[in-house]
Amino acid sequence: MRDRTHELRQGDDSSDDEDKERVALVVHPGTARLGSPDDEFFQKVRTIRQTIVKLENKVRELEKQQVTILATPLPEESMKQDLQNLRDEIKQLGRDIRAQLKAIEPQKEEADENYNSVNTRMRKTQHGVLSQQFVELINKCNLMQSEYREKNVERIRRQLKITNAGMVSDKELEQMLDSGQSEVFVSNILKDTQVTRQALNEISARHSEIQQLERSIRELHEIFTFLATEVEMQGEMINRIEKNILSSADYVERGQEHVKVALENQKKARKKKVFIAICLSITVLILVVIIVISTLV
């Protein structure tokens, strides 16, 4: 059993620890000066934040390129290659962030041993918040790509209707899309239909794009699945983190008000002391004058 007499002797300091924790929660990376281990930790946090910003910019760029390709009936190979390169960059950034988050994740043994440590809880808070941001961003990217897939399928469906191939049902269309082979997909469309070469080329291009997109979605999903599960399990902790941060900001604000009031009170107290000192001096002076006059008389 652990010797906790030292903790009992410092029972009065528990509220001070809580106050320190509140302050630690709102410390911005780079502003703390707590020693080498913490400097190294905050440097890693800064790196993760920067990588998340890069990922966010790439996702935004991906969205723009997808809109451009959707608006182009027959996108050039260079456009499709640029889009695929962007997807590859996003996947690599996702892997980098996952590894970086793993590097700052508090070890279970360390967390259990130092559960009441302000430093440990601060590290868990930072890791939880960054993980949540990463998962939300990847979810957004996956949702965006899923919507892009549906729009490509809709373009194929529209082309089939225009070329009198509208007898292909949605179920049959999905089965052809799932075939994974553009040749099989195109040959199925050609059966008993009159499809123009331009329409056929667009349908084939859309199908190829859908195949690449589905591979990208699967790979991206695999990158963050473990982290999404962890964040989901820590959902309650994330909510507590948000609550702690908000209460910390309120605590700091109230602390500033208290300091302001204390300074005002201190100023008033000084004025009172000066006033009392002047009154006493005048009283003593009057007494001295009275005594001197009495002596002369």
From Swiss-Prot:
Keywords: Cell membrane, Cell projection, Coiled coil, Hearing, Membrane, Neurotransmitter transport, Phosphoprotein, Transmembrane, Transmembrane helix, Transport. GO terms for biological process: exocytosis; intracellular protein transport; neurotransmitter transport; protein localization to cell surface; sensory perception of sound; vesicle docking; vesicle fusion. It comes from the Eukaryota. Residues 1-12 have a biased composition (Basic and acidic residues). It is a single-pass type IV membrane protein. Residues 1-275 are cytoplasmic. Disulfide bonds: none annotated. Residues 200-262 form the t-SNARE coiled-coil homology domain. The chain crosses the membrane at residues 276-296. Its main location: membrane. The modification Phosphoserine is found at residues 14-15, 36, 117, 208, 248. SUPFAM superfamilies: t-snare proteins (SSF47661). The modification Phosphothreonine is found at residue 31. Component of the SNARE complex composed of STX4, SNAP23 and VAMP7 that interacts with SYT7 during lysosomal exocytosis. Found in a complex with VAMP8 and SNAP23. Detected in a complex with SNAP23 and STXBP4. Interacts with VAMP2. Interacts with SNAP23 and SNAPIN. Interacts with LLGL1. Interacts (via C-terminus) with CENPF. Interacts with DOC2B. Interacts with STXBP6. Interacts with STXBP3; excludes interaction with DOC2B and SNAP25. Interacts with STXBP4; excludes interaction with VAMP2. Interacts with STXBP5L. Belongs to the syntaxin family. This is Syntaxin-4. It comes from Bos taurus. The lineage of its organism: Eukaryota, Metazoa, Chordata, Craniata, Vertebrata. The gene is STX4.
